[in-house]
């Protein structure tokens, strides 16, 4: 029996999303098992591995009073994830399939951080870029995935949706 093309596209996106989530979760598990909280290991001159817990959102916004707010963030995240998944499912035609690639990056990162936030109460961050004493916000692979997806969305909308 031949599988319809729409299911092949959905399967490709599913495996893409699953692999990014697995990479994110495995990297965070490695950090937990190999570093102490706030321990820093230099990798290269401008990058450290630095284990921190982010009780807030991006760039540690809303990080004070993590208790109740965590449930609200989990609820908001789950609603956003469902909306993106529904949008992706509706865009499985060949014309719209490449629109789903940025969505796949974003949904992967959202799910990776959602898992941390809902099961641990915080997100594990560990990538620390710096120049001398100036440090960018510490982040993780899920955050990188969200960033890549956002850049791809901007690129797609700027160069492919001119009509």
From Swiss-Prot:
Protein name, per record: Lipoprotein signal peptidase
Record field: catalytic activity: Release of signal peptides from bacterial membrane prolipoproteins. Hydrolyzes -Xaa-Yaa-Zaa-|-(S,diacylglyceryl)Cys-, in which Xaa is hydrophobic (preferably Leu), and Yaa (Ala or Ser) and Zaa (Gly or Ala) have small, neutral side chains
A Pfam match: Peptidase_A8
Subcellular location: Cell membrane
Record gene name: lspA
GO molecular function list: aspartic-type endopeptidase activity
Pathway(s) this gene product operates in, as recorded in its UniProt entry: Protein modification; lipoprotein biosynthesis (signal peptide cleavage)
Catalytic residues (UniProt): 125, 143
Species the sequence originates in: Buchnera aphidicola subsp. Baizongia pistaciae (strain Bp)
Membrane topology: Multi-pass membrane protein
Tagged with keyword Acetylation: no
Keywords, sorted A to Z: Aspartyl protease, Cell membrane, Hydrolase, Membrane, Protease, Transmembrane, Transmembrane helix
Keyword Cell membrane assigned: yes
Enzyme class: hydrolase
GO cellular component, one term: plasma membrane
EC number: 3.4.23.36
Role summary: This protein specifically catalyzes the removal of signal peptides from prolipoproteins.
Similarity field: Belongs to the peptidase A8 family.
One GO-annotated biological process of the protein: proteolysis
Bilayer-crossing regions: 3-23, 70-90, 94-114, 134-154
Main location class: membrane
HAMAP family given in the database record: LspA
């Amino acid at each position: 029996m031949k599988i319809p093309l729409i299911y092949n596209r959905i399967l490709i996106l599913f495996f893409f999303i699953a692999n990014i989530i697995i990479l994110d979760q495995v990297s965070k598990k490695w950090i937990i098992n190999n570093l102490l909280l706030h321990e820093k290991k230099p990798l290269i001159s401008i990058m450290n591995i630095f284990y921190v817990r982010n009780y807030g959102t991006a760039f540690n916004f809303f990080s004070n009073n993590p208790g109740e707010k965590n449930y609200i963030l989990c609820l908001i995240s789950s609603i956003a994830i469902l909306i993106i998944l529904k949008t992706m499912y509706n865009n499985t035609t060949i014309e719209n399939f490449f629109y789903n690639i940025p969505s796949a990056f974003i949904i992967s990162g959202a799910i990776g951080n959602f898992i941390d936030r809902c099961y641990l109460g915080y997100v594990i961050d560990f990538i620390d870029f710096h120049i001398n004493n100036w440090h960018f916000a510490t982040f993780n692979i899920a955050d990188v995935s969200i960033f890549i997806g956002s850049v791809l969305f901007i690129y797609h909308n700027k160069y492919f949706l001119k009509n």
